[in-house]
Amino acid sequence: SITKVFARTIFDSRGNPTVEVDLYTSKGLFRAAVPSGASTGVHEALEMRDGDKSKYHGKSVFNAVKNVNDVIVPEIIKSGLKVTQQKECDEFMCKLDGTENKSSLGANAILGVSLAICKAGAAELGIPLYRHIANLANYDEVILPVPAFNVINGGSHAGNKLAMQEFMILPTGATSFTEAMRMGTEVYHHLKAVIKARFGLDATAVGDEGGFAPNILNNKDALDLIQEAIKKAGYTGKIEIGMDVAASEFYKQNNIYDLDFKTANNDGSQKISGDQLRDMYMEFCKDFPIVSIEDPFDQDDWETWSKMTSGTTIQIVGDDLTVTNPKRITTAVEKKACKCLLLKVNQIGSVTESIDAHLLAKKNGWGTMVSHRSGETEDCFIADLVVGLCTGQIKTGAPCRSERLAKYNQILRIEEELGSGAKFAGKNFRAPS
């Protein structure tokens, strides 16, 4: 059982404070760190920040850390719960918080403990973390995912004019995760050369998630650059393209989207309606091998979401729309608004609820894509999560910046450990199991 738990402040990949939790059992120390997003959905569980502008620009997490050390820890130790009782531990903490969005203790406090318990539970049972997660979800097999590498950054993640937040490559034609990594990294380096030749060396500086942020305004130009890099690498037909538009970031009001939202007092020439935006995506899909579009519209623009989803066979992913929240997922299912859940553990705030969100999506015929946040740490829990939940797809940045590679490298190790029994999602990434 749990002998000691201690939380502290550490720093994420953007230099912002976040919560880290050390949990001790007779099997040793188990450490977990909590990630943080830049473009956060209004319906997410509450990430507790102190708001004291004189410290860390208001982003300190002293209260969340204090809530772990002074509230959660004494109660959970007193309860006598074991680390193998993930569901019971998570339910206990949620009850202790008592609010729907974890605003009393903070989702970042609860999640830190929940992740550490999960790691300790696997060790207690003497099994790998991914296998423990599979057991928690009642899965017999595990599957290695197709990585979605975010190679061009725009939106709130980059200082360029590009409105759409992420342009990704998915090596669906690979036969193993190792091969997918080779294909992804080779295209990444070709893309760097293409951007350098066209825009100069300073255009190859990287954004928060390791992708390039060339100063382009036209979203189609980003797709052209990627297509050229795929061709140069010799992977045409083997690598497909995904997008995360994060359209809530440039939604104005009255169904108007501003593709030049980063220019203050712009001339309004880039303002378009939801239907025009949908037409733009349809054009993209005709001209490029696009297989997945995330958050194509504002998080409350249900009608345009449903129109888009009913009118295309590609994967439409809900992130800001669903925020890993069962209530939002249920509404999206009823409205047929999307076809895939983006799973972010810190949007819902515990391991059990994350697994439940995936199972709810799967039950309704959706896919699930596991995701990092733009403010990441070296913790690679989501690598084991994606393998254990057999979701078949993960996005955790470009093959650049160690907090991104930490996850991809862990999946490589898992593939090696599974040996000849390793199953790779490949072309079936949307419904691998």
From Swiss-Prot:
The active site is at E209, K344. It is found in: Cytoplasm. Mn(2+) binds at D244, E294, D319. PROSITE patterns: ENOLASE (PS00164). This is Enolase. Pfam families: Enolase_C (PF00113), Enolase_N (PF03952). It catalyses: (2R)-2-phosphoglycerate = phosphoenolpyruvate + H2O. GO terms for molecular function: magnesium ion binding; phosphopyruvate hydratase activity. Its EC number is 4.2.1.11. Belongs to the enolase family. (2R)-2-phosphoglycerate binds at S36, H157, K344, R373, S374. Its cofactor is Mg(2+). The keyword Flavoprotein does not apply. Inhibited by 2-phosphoglycolic acid. Gene3D superfamilies: Enolase-like C-terminal domain, Enolase-like, N-terminal domain. Keywords: Acetylation, Cytoplasm, Glycolysis, Lyase, Magnesium, Metal-binding. InterPro entries: Enolase, Enolase-like_C_sf, Enolase-like_N, Enolase_C, Enolase_CS, Enolase_N. Homodimer. Pathway: Carbohydrate degradation; glycolysis; pyruvate from D-glyceraldehyde 3-phosphate: step 4/5.
